[in-house]
């Protein structure tokens, strides 16, 4: 319980926060095998993720459009070892209820790559259905304490089930008011917990609202 509540105090990675912050000095003091990055739209999640990928030695960034084009297919054709690892992971995930898709294969190609010291993923749930997200997070948790760090942006309650967060995971909240990111413990009543919870929604809700822009009807002219 104490391990979940209290982050490590050892400075692991320090950098200046990018816009929309004001260049404040920030330290990632609690880097674990799985690091969730959460925040509302416009809170700076992706810019923070890019800064982490820039400043973490040997890290790579998997963008939102990772499944587009033929880059993944080309990599898998040219790297038999990567292909074997992706096939093995895909088989495990499908057996656990996941749906095979180009989005999942592209994500696995990034996650199973040899070489990167850390992997930063923009919206890890992109293109994945509910069951696939649940299978994926279970798969990632099985990597154990010695696994290389993953920084995973998410707004999905299927992928980030707050009741299931374990000791090998951290939650980093990007607040709506652009105050510096803060670590949040996965317990009701913990500082920031409600803010994290309100950022998350099921894949079904996310699918219905994806791309929706708020609209306010025009008030009719009474004289018209």
Identify the residue ranges that each predicted region occupies.
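Conserved lysine of the Walker
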Residues: 45
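Conserved P-loop NTPase "ATPase switch" module shared by AAA+ and STAND
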Residues: 113-131
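Conserved nucleotide-sensing/catalytic segment adjacent to the nucleotide-binding pocket
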Residues: 71-118
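Post-Walker A alpha-helix
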Residues: 48-49, 53
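Hydrophobic anchor at the beta1->P-loop junction of P-loop NTPases
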Residues: 37
């Amino acid at each position: 319980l104490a391990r979940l509540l209290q982050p490590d105090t050892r400075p692991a990675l320090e950098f200046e926060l990018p816009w929309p912050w004001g260049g404040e000095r920030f330290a990632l003091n609690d880097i674990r095998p799985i690091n969730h990055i959460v925040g509302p739209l416009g809170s700076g999640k992706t810019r923070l993720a890019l800064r982490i990928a820039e400043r973490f030695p040997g890290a790579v960034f998997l963008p939102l459009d990772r499944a587009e084009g033929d880059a993944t297919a080309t990599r898998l054709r040219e790297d038999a070892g990567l292909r074997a690892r992706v096939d093995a992971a895909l088989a495990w995930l499908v057996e656990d209820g996941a749906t095979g898709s180009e989005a999942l294969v592209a994500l696995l190609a990034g996650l199973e790559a040899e070489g990167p010291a850390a992997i930063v993923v923009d919206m890890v749930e992109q293109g994945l259905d509910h069951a696939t997200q649940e299978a994926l997070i279970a798969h990632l948790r099985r990597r154990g304490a010695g696994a290389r760090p993953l920084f995973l942006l998410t707004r999905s309650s299927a992928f980030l089930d707050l009741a299931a967060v374990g000791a090998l995971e951290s939650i980093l909240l990007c607040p709506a008011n652009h105050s510096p990111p803060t670590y949040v413990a996965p317990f009701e009543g913990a500082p920031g917990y409600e803010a994290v919870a309100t950022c998350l929604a099921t894949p079904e809700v996310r699918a219905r609202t994806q791309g929706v822009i708020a609209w306010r009807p025009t008030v009719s002219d009474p004289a018209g």
